């Protein structure tokens, strides 16, 4: 039986709280069960050097975990003097995922940075970050539309992400830490709301998985993301 007696296709309770901080153009607290991430969107009227003069914008992301977001304290990466490989991999994934939902030409020569700070980790921090940052990004775009900086909405659609895996021989959706730590297969799937996939990251931690299991996992991810899109729409309507 899964933790909290969840069905195999049932994500953890999802909560998205908008306007969570005071200063950012978009800010969200996203909760996937006990995993909690603050996502803020910052708009700047400049782009990276490689994009200057091209009339296109940019969306990027940074990711980090508070020292006591986990069971035991982690040293801050700033204290170490460099980011770890896992951190860089995750923030690149978040940035790629969010760029897929934006028409960069319609954004114009400005950049939006999404900062995703994990305040409590219980599995799925990268998927929660993407799902919450999507809403923060839309709020930042709406800020630009409302003040007249933008006249055309560059948002192509919602983006959400969820983990799926095989635990004790059973395919399951939205793994929390106790499941993730013993999973035979772990996979993260990022999707647009029209069903197209942005990224699939899958690894056999124990037993290799079959083609049939892969298709089952992708179907579970689609079902899970559809529930996340509902949560995003509800939050954006508030």
UniProtKB/Swiss-Prot annotation:
According to its UniProt record, what is one Pfam family this protein matches?
RNase_PH_C
- Molecular function (Gene Ontology), one example: tRNA nucleotidyltransferase activity
Gene Ontology terms: biological process? rRNA catabolic process; rRNA processing; tRNA processing
Q: Which UniProt keywords apply?
A: Nucleotidyltransferase, RNA-binding, rRNA processing, Transferase, tRNA processing, tRNA-binding
Enzymatic class: transferase
EC numbers: 2.7.7.56
Residues noted as binding phosphate in the record, renumbered to the chain = 86, 124-126
Q: Which reaction does it catalyse?
A: tRNA(n+1) + phosphate = tRNA(n) + a ribonucleoside 5'-diphosphate
The record's comment on protein family reads: Belongs to the RNase PH family.
What do we know about how this protein assembles, alone or with others?
Homohexameric ring arranged as a trimer of dimers.
Function as written in the Swiss-Prot or TrEMBL entry: Phosphorolytic 3'-5' exoribonuclease that plays an important role in tRNA 3'-end maturation. Removes nucleotide residues following the 3'-CCA terminus of tRNAs; can also add nucleotides to the ends of RNA molecules by using nucleoside diphosphates as substrates, but this may not be physiologically important. Probably plays a role in initiation of 16S rRNA degradation (leading to ribosome degradation) during starvation.
HAMAP family, from UniProt? RNase_PH
The identity of this protein, by name, is Ribonuclease PH
């Amino acid at each position: 039986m899964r933790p909290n007696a969840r069905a195999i296709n049932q994500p953890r309770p999802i909560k998205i709280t908008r306007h969570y901080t005071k200063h950012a153009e978009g800010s969200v607290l996203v909760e996937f069960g006990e995993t909690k991430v603050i996502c803020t969107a910052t708009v700047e009227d400049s782009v990276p050097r490689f994009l200057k003069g091209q009339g296109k914008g940019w969306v990027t992301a940074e990711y980090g975990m508070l020292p006591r977001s986990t069971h035991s304290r982690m040293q801050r990466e700033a204290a170490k003097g460099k980011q770890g490989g896992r951190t860089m991999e995750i923030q690149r994934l978040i940035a790629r995922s969010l760029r897929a939902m934006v028409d960069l030409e319609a954004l114009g020569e400005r950049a939006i940075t999404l900062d995703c700070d994990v305040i409590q980790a219980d599995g799925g921090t990268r998927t929660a970050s993407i799902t919450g940052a999507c809403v923060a990004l839309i709020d930042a775009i709406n800020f630009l539309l409302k003040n007249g900086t933008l006249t055309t909405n560059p948002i192509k659609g919602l983006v959400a992400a969820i983990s799926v895996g095989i635990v004790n021989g059973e395919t399951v959706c939205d793994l929390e830490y106790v499941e993730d730590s013993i999973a035979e297969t772990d996979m993260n799937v990022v999707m647009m709301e029209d069903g197209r996939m942005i990224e699939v990251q899958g690894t056999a931690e124990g037993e290799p998985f079959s083609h049939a299991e892969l298709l089952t996992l992708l179907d579970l991810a689609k079902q899970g993301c559809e529930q996340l899109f509902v949560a995003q729409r509800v939050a954006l309507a508030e």
